[in-house]
Amino acid sequence: MALVAIIFLAIIIVSIILGWGLFFKTYSKLLIAALILLLSFLVLLFFTTIHSIDVLDNAKDYSKIGPYGDYIGGILNPLIAVFAVFAAGFAFYAQYEANKQVQDQFKSQQFESQFFEMLRLHKENVNEMKITGYDSVIQETLDNEKKVVQIVRSHNTKIIEGRKVFVSMVVELISCYEFLEEINSTWKVRYDPIDLLKLSYRIFFFGSNSELVILEKIDIDFIDHVKIQLRKHRKRHRDSYSRKNVYQGLNKKIELFIKYSPFTGHENRLGHYYRHLYSTVKYVVNKEREGLIDYKQSRDYLKILRSQMSNDEQLMLYYNYIIGFGKDWENDGYLTKYRMLHNLPIDKVKYAENPRVHFQEFINSIKPGEGHLFEWGDVEQ
């Protein structure tokens, strides 16, 4: 009988160890309480069994221990029933947790599928960007002595597409600002550089003929004069098929090295591009808030998105933000906390506040191990 007691005690110990490994570390406090209650029943069952074994060992007339059998049966039956109830409860709970894990895995797969679909659409948006422009080709005819005897200029249609569009956009925006800077130098009122940049971006985005080219801090007469001057520059550029591309600015040369008619606007291209890019970032961040992914995973997914953006795309994103069009980008820290400007070519930022200065407060709050805000460093070398 002593062997039976030892075996029973071993079962209790194994139950405790398994309960700890399977439930205490993994599941809720409710399960811990249930396991403690179950353990209490097992302890009671152990002492009941020990008492029964002692009675059987000391019995002289087994015909008189029938009441003990009834007693033991009365104790064991409900204990076994309770044990069975708890065992079934644990089984149902384990199944519930398993189903929950399956659901979470499905949600994770659904999220990844949607994210990579949005990533694919972003790449399509970039690849489908197109500007129909012009180019001038010079063909020379040589004689036998290799002297030029004839020069023929022909004009061809030039298509700028894909990421090259953003390269030209940066040139156009900077040139537009430099034209405004030169015009403002002789105007009766001197406007702040940031206001000139905001007006330049509106002209760049909507086109110089748009009624949306207006700014509260700049007089309408100045804006009308700017529009007239830009139309003249556009006509020279277009009539020369981009050969007339260097103009005199304020103590500098304005280099309008693009192959299409400048200052006609990019609203139809950039509007959709920025909306989709913003929606993709917002989608990832919202999934973090829902608890589906953590902050590190959000950064990893957005790093994949950012890797699809060229330096000029990030440069245009910064300009779009700094002049106010894209101010919502920083409401939830998309540019800083989630590092959407991490690869920004800081040295190419012209006429706007230095990004290191603009985001200085956030840079000072970065903790060790969180990584720099900018790939090129958060402190100017």
Which residues are covered by each model-predicted region?
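Intrinsically disordered, low-complexity polar regions and short flexible loop motifs
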Residues: 3, 15-20, 107-381
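Transmembrane signal-anchor/signal-peptide helices with a preference for the extracytoplasmic
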Residues: 83-109
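Short hydrophobic membrane-inserting helices
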Residues: 1-83, 87-90, 119, 128-135
